[in-house]
Regions:
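Single conserved hydrophobic/aromatic residue that forms the stacking wall/gate
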Residues: 1-11
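N-terminal glycine-rich phosphate-binding loop for ADP-containing cofactors
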Residues: 9-198
Length: 198
């Protein structure tokens, strides 16, 4: 697995307080890998663990708490991307980072989150859309001005979300297979808050 972000732009952060690579550094590779294994055990192929993260968790690299993660840290402050990580993954340092548009990066992150939130509703883990929104605002720092993940999803509409997730599924496979509930909402022309509102 290659690291696909152009680190210099840190565009991965989108509207979130930190981007995914920095978040993993904050949490630590060991804990992130353990969480990934637990999610895989609970949800199977839908949430395969990152092979790169598993490999990194088996090294001395711990993330920010160890001073070395995706970024180098001095005195607890993020300094710059740590390109030595490529050696630990046994892949060459790319001459040019793969370029993805800001829109594509945000879409891949947010559509994946919406799809998993849909699974949580479908599986009865949560009963209402506002529960998902509160959990993501309080737990991940999802921007409150968006109203929460599913309130934001409703501004896009499940039909549009389904269309874009299916496009990603064509390119990236089962990681983007749409939740059956998302298909149902799109077919019935219902939003999350219409179907699962308070």
């Amino acid at each position: 697995t290659r690291l696909r972000c152009d680190w210099s732009s840190d565009v991965c952060s989108s509207d979130l307080p930190v981007g995914p690579l920095r978040l993993i550094d904050e949490i630590g590779f060991d804990i992130s890998s353990h969480a990934g294994a637990s999610l895989h055990k609970a949800f199977g192929e839908r949430l395969n663990p990152s092979l790169a993260l598993v490999a990194l968790s088996e090294t001395d690299r711990l993330g920010k708490k160890g001073g070395q993660g995706f970024y180098q840290y001095e005195k607890g402050r993020r300094e710059k991307p740590d390109e030595s990580i490529y050696g630990e993954l046994q892949i060459p340092v790319p001459a040019e980072p793969q370029k993805f548009s800001d829109h594509e990066i945000r879409a891949r992150l947010v559509l994946q989150m919406i799809n998993e939130a849909t699974h949580a509703l479908q599986d009865g883990i949560v009963q209402r859309a506002d529960q998902v929104d509160l959990a993501l605002i309080m737990g991940t720092g999802f921007p409150p001005f968006r109203g929460g993940l599913l309130r934001f999803a409703d501004t896009l509409h499940p039909r549009s979300i389904l269309y874009h997730i299916r496009k990603l599924e064509e390119v990236y496979g089962t990681r983007f297979t749409p939740a059956p509930l998302l298909i149902d909402l799109a077919e019935r022309d219902r939003t999350f808050y219409q179907a699962f509102g308070t």
